[in-house]
Amino acid sequence: MQMDNDFIKKLGYRALDNRLKRISDRMSHDTRKFFKQIDIDVEPSWHLVFKLLGEYKTLTMVEIAQQLGYTHPSMVVMLKKMTTKGYIVSEQDSIDKRKQNLRLTQKSIDLLPDLELIWHSCEDAIFKMLNEDLSILDRLDEIEESLKSIPFNERFYNEYQKQKI
């Protein structure tokens, strides 16, 4: 029996989440390979933290999570790895002792010019991969806004209830 080589693609919109994850995983994997190739010990997902702390200098974990729309647990893992690698430091807030302020280390600050060049090259590669057509971003914005207004689990549950009738 001949099998279709791309089951996810064959399913179309019914596997949208899997397809988006596959694209994301592929880009992250390839970016990780690129960083190894140029001997820079950075994870692809860290670039947004570098950019935020480069711009704002000091932020709390909660502020970073809010800016990126990430969950607190995923931020804890990411920021711990960045701290372990010596890219960020955590300092107790002088006013609110419960808060930990995060900032880039000198190692990160020294690396920023190289990272800026890398990010610009990555942006150019993405732009060209999209054939200079950024309309996909508008569609992604619509999907994200739609999910904010009615979470997917509610949509899913409503459709499930209709099917049961």
Segment roles from a protein language model:
Residues H29-T71:
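N-terminal helix-turn-helix DNA-binding core of bacterial DNA-binding proteins
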Residues M1-D39:
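N-terminal leader segment of winged-helix/HTH proteins
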Residues K80-D138:
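Charged, amphipathic alpha-helical coiled-coil/dimerization segments
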Residues D25, D39-I40, T58, E116, ...:
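Alpha-helix boundary/capping and short turn/kink residues
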Residues M1-I8, E132-I165:
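C-terminal regulatory/oligomerization modules of transcriptional regulators
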Residues M27-F34, L68, L111-L130, I143-I150, ...:
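Alpha-helical linker/hinge and terminal dimerization helices associated
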Residues G12, L16, S45-W46, K107:
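N-terminal positioning helix adjacent to the helix-turn-helix/winged-helix DNA-binding module
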